[in-house]
Amino acid sequence: MGSFAGACEIVEEKDDEVRLPKHSGRYGKSVMGSSSKDLVERKQREYHGSLEYDIDMLFQSISVKPSTTRLMSSSFHHHETSASAGPSRTTSPSKRIASMKKPGTPQSPRFVGLSDSVSLKQALRDRCISKASEMAAQKRLSKSAAASPRVSEADRIKSLYNQVSNESTSSRSGLVPVDKGKGSLVEIPLMPVNDKPSSSKSVPQRFEDPSNPISEPSQAGTSFGLQGVGNQTREIKLLHRSNKPGSCLSSGSGDYEIELDENVASPSTHAFVEDDVIEIDKHVTSLPSHSSKKVNATELDKNISSSAVDSEQKGKLDDAPNSGTENGKTVRKVTRMIPRPKQPKKKILLKKKLKIGVVSATYPTKDDEEIVPSLDSSANQLLCQRCHCSLKSTSIDDNPPSYTSSHNPKICTDSLSSVSNKEAHQGSDENSSGSCNVSQSSEADIVIMKQDVSSSNNSGIGAMVEKETENPTSSEKFEFSLSSKDSLGDYSRSTSISEESNLSRFSCGNKPHMSMDVRWEAIKHIKVQYGSLGLRHFNLLKKLGCGDIGTVYLAELIGTNCLFAIKVMDNEFLARRKKSPRAQAEREILKMLDHPFLPTLYAQFTSDNLSCLVMEYCPGGDLHVLRQKQLGRCFPEPAARFYVAEILLALEYLHMLGIIYRDLKPENILVREDGHIMLTDFDLSLRCAVNPTLVRSNSPPGKDPARISGPYNTSNCIQPFCITEPSCQVSCFSPRLSSNQQQGRKPKRGDHLSKTQQHLSRSLPQLVAEPTEARSNSFVGTHEYLAPEIIKGEGHGAAVDWWTFGVLLYELLYGKTPFKGYNNDETLANVVLQNLKFPDSPLVSFQAKDLIRGLLVKEPENRLGSEKGSVEIKRHPFFEGLNWALIRCAIPPELPDFYEYGGGPEAAADSPGGSNNRYLECKAIGDHLEFELF
């Protein structure tokens, strides 16, 4: 039967049986007829029911809409009710005959069937001839505008689907009515033929039109050939099993149901009108040849990425019969030719994009589904999802084997295979269309993946990771990525640090806040060059100080200008005095530290029974020496606040790690070259457990703790509301505005906050990481800085650091410690018994005195910071206006003087005695460098 308006009939014939006589038609078409009247009558009796059923299905599934020229009728009558009625004509006989006389007009093949159905087939043939004549005339009229762009493919596909009208179907045929918005179902019946000879056969016709050359019939088992596919978008469509009734495609012993969506029309769906033939490429799904199951083709994604198509790369359509063998029977398949009305020509604006979409669909449950076996690799036939026509497999195995499965597609028991042709590069052969990818998904999900490649080389593809389907039962992920060398700058969703970079980062103990320090590279270079680092790689320039367990030297790394502070400890001396545990504790603590106000341990090694710790060098000396240089031997209050604020952050970090410092004094606070401080000496520190918690502020509502303290407050003002964070937060150490300045300035948006909002901002949760449960009975520290609980021997915890913090602030402001006596015994007695007193000079603000009073409370449980640690202290009015997050951006009160050894070997060579005197002897260079330990 000839094809018309969106359908084709596929019938079977038995080879080597009855050979029907053939004769040529008017236009060179082969027409087959019955050999005798007896044969026709016998075939009528044997196949009367089957033929009527197929014709009934054909006329019910296909209804051609009337065209703009009213050349086609709107419907057909049922065969059972009006089998002998003549076909309805929409054109007069004269017009129809005139159209048939036009040169080059193709006509449908004549076929001789049963006597009862001659009138219906004749009507079908006449309609095909009329339609073909109309399209040929329109084709000649459109040649004048050949220079204009082609009609948009979206409009062509849409017009193709619009030709199928809405018509109710009977339950016997199982056809689904057409819905323009949701898709249409097109049925292609395949008639199985038994061993008896067949009298109803259809032969494809050949149109000899020079403008549309048709290739010779293929013997490879397919009827459509696609050529010249390049720079086009491919899709992955996953098919799902279903047993729901619908339009089915009979294939041997099984039915396959394919649902089409008319919204699929897009520039990526290539269909070309050339001499009444529609060329359709790419969107193909492998069709099993030996299967008795049903398959649903899910609706395609509406937003399909488009790609450019060059005119010289357009493929030609083969209109050749396809002979295949199914279940021991020979099947002859006839391809259809769809005439198309003239469409207005438009420009096609194409964009290349990469899109991954995951959509879900509702399908029958597992109880209703049937398992589809694997496909036979020998029968690899492709079926177009839009026109239901067999296509030639154009996949070329020119890709790596790991991504190629074009010739052996397989279907697992829990999912169906989907065929995807990868994009060909611009510079590759136009006949190469990539390889086929087979992916899997769960039964209730559909994954549509579109990929477009516009790069001319293999390194421009990039990494692509497919989203995991939302079905909880699915545990498979599809991930496509390239090497990091091919996709520099691309980050996948499962990014991880490489082992090489990870080892290079932590092999030398690199710290984030010191990651840009050139001293790391210098140390690493020596380790790589010599295999290990030792004392022989350093030149000792100067003795910086002596402590209880070791001596600190200024050293220079040989071959560089990098200066380090090396703490050298004699292992035999430590073992003899039972101080090895203290040295070991300091090494472990230094390894843990990573803070801008704490030392950085660059390396540690043992050389000649000497344990060495290589740390950063602070050329500014310590706060004790720096205080001696100040006028009145005390710091101004702003400078003191700068230093104690950074010390407070260092103590907060230590307490968060479960480290109680216990030896806070000006001698252990060094000044870096940038003016900021560094806390050092951890041999007396105590390690304990800590449990960080979040707490809320308990300040009374409606009160501003920043304004509570003043000249009229008494000394007994250490209340919870005094330690609340101030409402206004400005930059580090910015000058306060007087009342006159505040009255003269313009109000800002933040000034209009309600009291409730201000209270909520002050009552935000605070992190408390104070080791409140830590207890120790050791008598450690310096006499003047010892806490009362240490002297009494009652056991102590983290509160001893806040006592020493108060003593340090007192000394920085007044130039002396608050409880110093004539000797150590009197000093200890004053710490326990004497009340805190403030000298009359220098003048110190009330906020500073109030903070000192809160810190120097003799009962540790009532001491400021004993409950919540640094959170309580940071909220004190003494630190009002301090931005703790940007404290490193604040300008230091004083920068250290230029150090003569900072110039490296050149500066040392200019020193008296030349380079031979660079190495100094270990002798005391001042009392202020000695570590006074109890």
Curated annotation (Swiss-Prot):
Its EC number is 2.7.11.1. Its main location: cytoplasm. Autophosphorylated. Residues 538-879 form the Protein kinase domain. Residues 20-40, 70-113, 189-227, 305-343, 395-438, 466-493, 738-773 are annotated as: Disordered. Expressed in roots, cauline leaves, flowers and siliques. GO terms for cellular component: cytoplasm; nucleus. The active site is at D663. Residues 82-94, 212-227, 395-421, 755-764 have a biased composition (Polar residues). Keywords: ATP-binding, Cytoplasm, Kinase, Nucleotide-binding, Nucleus, Serine/threonine-protein kinase, Transferase. SMART domains: S_TKc (SM00220). GO terms for molecular function: ATP binding; kinase activity; protein kinase activity; protein kinase binding; protein serine kinase activity; protein serine/threonine kinase activity. InterPro entries: Kinase-like_dom_sf, Prot_kinase_dom, Ser/Thr_kinase_AS. It catalyses: L-seryl-[protein] + ATP = O-phospho-L-seryl-[protein] + ADP + H(+); L-threonyl-[protein] + ATP = O-phospho-L-threonyl-[protein] + ADP + H(+). The keyword Cytoplasm applies. It is found in: Cytoplasm; Nucleus. ATP binds at L544, G545, C546, G547, D548, I549, G550, T551, V552, K567. Interacts with KCBP. Interacts with PERK8, PERK9, PERK10 and PERK13. Could be involved in the negative regulation of root growth. Belongs to the protein kinase superfamily. Ser/Thr protein kinase family. This is Serine/threonine-protein kinase KIPK1. The lineage of its organism: Eukaryota, Viridiplantae, Streptophyta, Embryophyta, Tracheophyta. The gene is KIPK1.
